[in-house]
Amino acid sequence: GAFIPRWAQVDGEAELQRRMGAPETRRRLIEEVRTNLRRRGGAASQIIAFSRQDRSLEGRSLADIAEMRRQAPEETALDLVAAGGASIVSFNMSEDDLEHIMRQSYTMTSSDGGLVPMGDGKPHPRSYGAHARKLERYVRNRKVVSLESAVRSMTSLPATVFGLTNRGVIQTGAWADLAIFKPGEIHETATYNDPHQVAQGMHAVVVNGIVVIENGKFTSAAPGRVLSKN
């Protein structure tokens, strides 16, 4: 669906299916999907993360699947959508841009990784390792930002921006949300081929005053709560 133009998605799934099947609108879709693929780095840069219809496609590029099916990549993309869709990992970011943005004082650290059951499909490894990657790669190894700046971007800055009082800081009266780690031990283990791996080096995590990770292991506690803007 990431390659499908918005006009084709108007009025829901049934209308999208009709447009993909109608010769006139399908020709238009093929042209626009081809353009969208090119803007995203090409078919070889699009990796299937999860396919409910055909799990054998997971981990393969759209280019590989198209070659296997003897189709143009844009045709394959439309066929995958018609069959129920698939989630993708897209390699189309500039490392220089990422580091420049990371250095800005207003940049917060987050992730749009999907919340899928552990072991289900091949989601982007950021689902498990986004924050560990920043601490390991961009703080410790590449020294793009300081540890203090990185921690602020993950804690007090988001809390301030979203109006979450008594969050993101360690002080009397604030909620006890704590992460205890040694910077030199933080290590991202999730990969594109094996993404369901929890990052290493987090000794303890406390949520709302309750320990949820102890000695690197999950406890059975679930003290999290939905936060609303104050």
Named regions from a protein language model:
Residues 1-143:
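Active-site neighborhoods of metal-dependent hydrolases
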Residues 1, 55, 83-87, 115-119, ...:
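Flexible loop/turn segments at secondary-structure boundaries
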Residues 88-98, 142-151, 159-196:
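Acidic, glycine-enriched loop/beta-strand segments at the rims
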Residues 74, 132, 148-155:
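Hydrophobic face of alpha-helices
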Residues 28, 100-106, 111-112, 180-227:
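C-terminal cap of metal-dependent C-N hydrolases
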Residues 67, 82, 102, 106, ...:
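Hydrophobic alpha-helix feature that most strongly marks membrane-spanning transmembrane helices
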